[in-house]
């Protein structure tokens, strides 16, 4: 079970959107994805809760958009040493977004592994109204990748919105 630093609002009418997506995205792709995410979120803003692990790449782009549009960020930390597994370049943004989170839930894993990442992804999907998948449609490069999260969400009947604009590329 996850431990919680704060509890989400019960009975809230806010739209809960989880995110899963690729990391290490080229700058041009980040711009395309950011534009698309902001356009989609504007339908709900500011009444939106973005649920994310704050991984580098798509997760942080999504969380920034939620914050900038006046929504709330809820963070799920997959493992005690999760931050250390992120790219060095992502630490600053991770720390800033983490500090602004409305709630933080920590899973009981020590090491940041594929299993802890998938457990976190399952948790965010289970509690979401919808999943935004920043995904090129290709198979996961390892267990717990975006394709696995999309398959899990679809199996549960959670609506999935794939975000991969024309011109987007993986790093």
Regions found by a protein language model. Give the residues of each.
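Acidic/glycine-enriched connector segments
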Residues: 8-170
